[in-house]
Amino acid sequence: MDKFTKLTGVAAPLPIVNIDTDMIIPKDYLKTIKRTGLSKGLFAEMRFNEDGTENPDFVLNKPGYRNAQILVAGDNFGCGSSREHAPWALLDFGIRCVISTSFADIFYNNCFKNGILPIKVAQEDLDKLMDDASRGANATLTVDLEAKEIHGPDGGSISFDVDDFKRHCLLNGLDDIGLTMEKAGSIDTFEAKRAELRPWA
């Protein structure tokens, strides 16, 4: 998993509340267990028309936002079913950070496990960031996980809270496997000692 320390990138505004995981990636794209190639399904029902052509009005199809790395979204983002494909699709598109006033718990935790930083902010701060994100190609934010701050294009900053353990994992690029490998030495020592004490096992 890639480390997340400081990210400067274009922020796309998505001022829609209750975006569920089926809206993030429809069920038609859940037939794979691969984490790559899912970007084509991200917000598919909003990004594409029925004939498969792009919907020019959807934010991620607009020229200034095609390479967005940050998503500023409405309240209760990621509600609905617990599909882990939702953060996979966001990450495959290039989204490394989602900012909202609240998230569904399972989606929130899945983001951390997949290298995405979900940030909860107050409504007034979200309104400010949504305005900042509406500037098209100039909608650049800097998210500093070490300092726990978001810096806007005008130089202002917003502080945010994040669980210390989850922050540690993102800063060091540790997923569940990485966390286990951190303890590899202790595990090897335990296994060797157990073999001495219980050679028959």
Swiss-Prot record:
<dbReference type="GO" id="GO:0009316">
    <property type="term" value="C:3-isopropylmalate dehydratase complex"/>
</dbReference>
<protein>
    <recommendedName>
        <fullName>3-isopropylmalate dehydratase small subunit</fullName>
        <ecNumber>4.2.1.33</ecNumber>
    </recommendedName>
</protein>
<dbReference type="InterPro" id="IPR000573">
    <property type="entry name" value="AconitaseA/IPMdHydase_ssu_swvl"/>
</dbReference>
<comment type="similarity">
    <text>Belongs to the LeuD family. LeuD type 1 subfamily.</text>
</comment>
<dbReference type="GO" id="GO:0009098">
    <property type="term" value="P:L-leucine biosynthetic process"/>
</dbReference>
<keyword id="KW-0100">Branched-chain amino acid biosynthesis</keyword>
<keyword id="KW-0456">Lyase</keyword>
<dbReference type="InterPro" id="IPR004431">
    <property type="entry name" value="3-IsopropMal_deHydase_ssu"/>
</dbReference>
<dbReference type="InterPro" id="IPR033940">
    <property type="entry name" value="IPMI_Swivel"/>
</dbReference>
<comment type="function">
    <text>Catalyzes the isomerization between 2-isopropylmalate and 3-isopropylmalate, via the formation of 2-isopropylmaleate.</text>
</comment>
<comment type="pathway">
    <text>Amino-acid biosynthesis; L-leucine biosynthesis; L-leucine from 3-methyl-2-oxobutanoate: step 2/4.</text>
</comment>
<dbReference type="InterPro" id="IPR050075">
    <property type="entry name" value="LeuD"/>
</dbReference>
<comment type="subunit">
    <text>Heterodimer of LeuC and LeuD.</text>
</comment>
<keyword id="KW-0028">Amino-acid biosynthesis</keyword>
<dbReference type="GO" id="GO:0003861">
    <property type="term" value="F:3-isopropylmalate dehydratase activity"/>
</dbReference>
<dbReference type="InterPro" id="IPR015928">
    <property type="entry name" value="Aconitase/3IPM_dehydase_swvl"/>
</dbReference>
<dbReference type="Pfam" id="PF00694">
    <property type="entry name" value="Aconitase_C"/>
</dbReference>
<keyword id="KW-0432">Leucine biosynthesis</keyword>
